[in-house]
């Protein structure tokens, strides 16, 4: 008669397999970024000679020993004395990466602040107020989430052109002032806030705006941080719309500036990778600072409202 497996052993096996799968997934996700960082520290000749290695030759012990003994090595040409951060410095001095980074920061920051304000007010109206056609309007709002961004590109450009905002700061940020996903996310979160708090505030003489500012928003910090992070990331990574609406290089964000940088540098990949690493640092910093709110905001917003 076959005895059942030990439950503790089964639990350990499941945990082991889960660890292995997650470790493989982590390697798949981290490897491209590690490759980009390693390539950004190489010279142009080093990258052309060895595109596969993650570690530049100057950091490899074997190549260092060969160079010290006078043997033929990858450090025999300009690699030994090449400053480690030269690609980063050249990107700022010659490639205007600092200007592109500042533009991206301004665009993403302004869009995030305005979209949080507009979406929070709209979500509060859908979640806490009752008016005629509320369900129909909300359904139409959700339907806009099914439209591909490419479909809206021409109508948005026509509107921006009619307003005379082509090739300007406001022309870039105007289409991002509101979003259906943000309204939906915040509405779901607002509907989970106990209604007794709002009723008690109204008994004390608070109006709708005061309730929104002093009760709803403070209790919705996880959802607001989550939406702010998603909005900032979308604005930071935006490429097609700035490319369409801008022609002055002084207004270029980093995403568009990188394509220009590639043409000017003659496909100097180490320098391009260095600019890409600099462009990724703000998003990484934001995720590290807001990660404890991220999962909570999404999970609580997805709960069924009572």
Where are these regions (language model features)?
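A structural signal for multi-pass alpha-helical bundles of membrane permease subunits
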Residues: 2-306
